[in-house]
Design a protein with these regions (language model features):
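Conserved N-terminal segment of class I S-adenosyl-L-methionine
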Residues: 1-148, 152, 163-166, 243-246, ...
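S-adenosyl-L-methionine-dependent methyltransferase catalytic module, highlighting the catalytic core
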Residues: 47-51, 55-59, 114, 121-122, ...
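Short alpha-helical scaffold segments that flank and stabilize functional sites
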Residues: 67, 95, 176, 282-283
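Short catalytic micro-motifs in class I SAM-dependent methyltransferases
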Residues: 153-157
C-alpha cells in the first residue's frame, strides 16, 4: 500500500504504519452483525473491513499528518487535538504516536454495543480520551478547548446544515488554535465528467434506494466556494484551502491512469476529490 500513498515524510509513514496495524487488530476483533442489522450497507464493509476503513482512507490521514508535522506545528507546540466524528481512531492513534494529547468525539452507541465497547477499550489501551457524544445534538461543555480541532469527511453525511456543528467546534477551539476541515468535492474532475455524460455524481442510486431512512451515505458534498461560506458563517477565517486526490485505487485501472494524465491539461481549478481547509478562529 505504501506505493499508493501520497508522498510524505518517513516520520508520517512510520506512525501511519503503526496506527494501521493497531486498527487492523481492532477491526478483526469487532462483531459487525449489530451494525449490519441496523443498516445492510455495512455488510460490504464488514466483508473487507481493512480495505474500506483503512486502505481507502489512508491518504486523507497522510495529508493531515503531513500538514501538521511540516507546516502547522513542526515544533510540536499545539499538543491538544480533538477529532470530532472520527468513528475509527486511525488519525488520532497516529497523532498520539507523535506525542499529541488526543480526544475523540462520536456517538458510538449508533454503531452498536459491540462496536462501542471495542473502541472504548482500544482508547483506554492507546492513551486516547473518548467522549461518546452526538456531535450535533449533545453539549460539548465537558470537552476542553483544543489547539487543533479536526473534522474529516463527516458533514457530507448530515441530513441538514453543518453550520451548528461547525459553530460548536469553533467554540471549543482555542483563540490561537486551528481547525482542519475535510469534505468530498462534489465538483471534482471525475464527477464533472460524469454529469456531462448524464450520470449522477452522487452515491450509487441502488444503495440509496434500498437503504433505511435516514440515509447514512453522502447526502451533500460541497464545493470550494461552499466550504468558504461555511467557515465564514461559523466565524472561522480560512488560512489555506486546496483540493486533492485521496483515493489510492483510482489510478490502478487504465481508465484511472488516463484521467490522471488528462486532468492537468484541463484549464480549471479545484478538480481534486476532496477539499481541505485550514482555518483560524476569527478575532
Amino acid at each position: 500500500m505504501k506505493n499508493t500513498r501520497l508522498k510524505t515524510t518517513n516520520e508520517v509513514n512510520k506512525v501511519i504504519d503503526i496506527a494501521s496495524e493497531k486498527i487492523r487488530i481492532l477491526l478483526d476483533s469487532i462483531d459487525f452483525s449489530e451494525q449490519i442489522r441496523r443498516n445492510a450497507l455495512y455488510q460490504k464493509y464488514a466483508d473487507n473491513r481493512f480495505h474500506y476503513y483503512v486502505e481507502m482512507e489512508v491518504n486523507r490521514y497522510v495529508k493531515v499528518l503531513d500538514l501538521i508535522t511540516t507546516k502547522l506545528d513542526p515544533d510540536r507546540k499545539m499538543l491538544n487535538v480533538c477529532d470530532y466524528g472520527c468513528m475509527l481512531p486511525i488519525l488520532p492513534t497516529a497523532l498520539t504516536e507523535l506525542g499529541y494529547n488526543v480526544t475523540i468525539v462520536d456517538k458510538y452507541e449508533y454503531y452498536g454495543d459491540e462496536f462501542k465497547n471495542s473502541v472504548k477499550n482500544y482508547c483506554d489501551q492507546n492513551n486516547l480520551k473518548i467522549f461518546d457524544l452526538d456531535i450535533l445534538n449533545d453539549s460539548f461543555d465537558i470537552i476542553e478547548k483544543s489547539d487543533i480541532s479536526i473534522n474529516l469527511a463527516v458533514v457530507e453525511h448530515l441530513n441538514g446544515s453543518p453550520k451548528k456543528l461547525i459553530n460548536k467546534i469553533r467554540n471549543k477551539t482555542k483563540e490561537d488554535g486551528l481547525f482542519i476541515f475535510d469534505v468530498p468535492n462534489i465538483a471534482n474532475f471525475v464527477k464533472r465528467v460524469r454529469s456531462l455524460m448524464g450520470y449522477s455524481p452522487l452515491d450509487d442510486y441502488n444503495d440509496y434506494l434500498n437503504a433505511p431512512y435516514p440515509y447514512m451515505g453522502h447526502n451533500r458534498e460541497m464545493t470550494v466556494s461552499e466550504v468558504k461560506a461555511l467557515m465564514s458563517a461559523a466565524s472561522f477565517s480560512i488560512q489555506h484551502i486546496e483540493t486533492y486526490d485521496f483515493n489510492p485505487f483510482s489510478t490502478i485501472t487504465n481508465k484511472g491512469k488516463f484521467i490522471k494524465a488528462l486532468k492537468p491539461m484541463i484549464p480549471m481549478r479545484h478538480l481534486g476529490e476532496c477539499i481541505l481547509a485550514i482555518s483560524a478562529v476569527k478575532k
